[in-house]
Amino acid sequence: MPTTVFCLHALGSSSEEFVGLRTRLAGTLDLVGIDLPGFGTSTAATGTTVEEMVVLVERAIGRSGVTEWALLGHSMGGKVASVVASRTVDGSNGLFGLRAVVLLAASPLSPEPMDDERRATMLGWAADGEIGPDEAETFVDANTASRLAPEPHATAVHDVQRALPQAWTDWLVRGSREDWSTVFPANPVPALVLAGAEDGDLGPDAQRSLNLPHWSAGEFDVVPGAAHLLPWEQPDEVADRIRDFWRRRVDHGPVVPADTARVIASPRVSARTRGILAVRSLPDAPDREPRALTRGQLDTLRALARVVVPQPGDRPVDLALRVDDQLADGLGDGWRPDGLPADVDAYRAGLDALRADATQGDEHLAAVLGSITAGEYTPVSGGLDSGQLQAWAEDAAVDLAKQWMAHPATMAAVDYDGFANGGDGLRKQGFLLLGADEREAWEPTGAAR
């Protein structure tokens, strides 16, 4: 089943702007548009601040019941999507299952760059209580590289006209100026940041400097022949980039089963724990350069991982890449076997010693590891003696196994839900049934034995 993508539109637009993308991405992704307050078919009763728009979106995602999802935000909707994503990753909004974010000419978390004269002109359009057809058409034409075809042009103009003037004004006066840039740290969710080549205030330079730095796993691209209204102007180009990003960067690695994901999203789990599990569940970047090891050493560690922690199915966790991150961040277990150098140096030496054996297939490597464990292997390279290599191999096996067990999908596979011992309330729910083979009503069904 395709992953659900919740789509948040631009100022003066609605979920209608994603119809073309929805058709083009059908079968890969299921796009679901959300009309933000005061736009499309949505009233402004829930409020028009960024916080209020974020809450509306979070509630819509929660009501949907989906447990694997992504966000797509265009212009104004990009700012909202960025806040929702950050509150999901830190666990504070009670959502779980975010896989990726796509931003189209997005308004940044910082105040949006906008020419003062243009802002004043746009405010003037709504001053008399409605945005007229001429003003709406002027807005659409000013935000496209060339005039849209008649049907999308008419829809885009209609969307501007039906925008509630108060919502339009509130964004220009307040929402676009709100500064959320210091509220959240860089977000590790895989992100695709797209800019229209002919956009003005939110063009390529603005996206590179204001949006991309917020995403530590972000990618950037420019869509030719487009200004600001990318989904209307270049739906094929935008869809192709999203599809490639999804297949190459996101659609791999295990997905947390729905019943476990719902427990993680529930009040039984603290925000801090939910945030940790959210980051652990993100897809790895298989083509990313290693941070602590060389590319050759990482390949050897991947071979070692296949032998030491064989994973079922065709969507494994990239354990080696996660251990590389662990080494780069200095997040070891605090123990070093007597006689071994620092963790990073020990890994480099141990992997260099096994490089030739790793190229001869997993079965051969498994036999070599057996000899190492028995203390019967004499390394010919890498700088470690037999005893040191034995100690390092044991340490590496522990690191790989820990990374595997830390993934929420693995926890589901081994029927572990001990993380759900109580949320952030004054009273922890805890567990009532502690006997063997006893399962509480809220617990996931568990893996088949």
Enumerate the language-model features and the residues they cover:
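Flexible, low-complexity segments enriched for small/polar residues
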Residues: G275-E289, L301-A393
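Conserved loop-alpha-helix segment in the C-terminal half of the alpha/beta-hydrolase fold
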Residues: T23, P190-A226
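Conserved HGGG/HGGXW glycine-rich cap/lid loop of the alpha/beta-hydrolase fold
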Residues: M1-T43
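The conserved beta1-alpha1 loop
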Residues: L8-A10, H74, A195
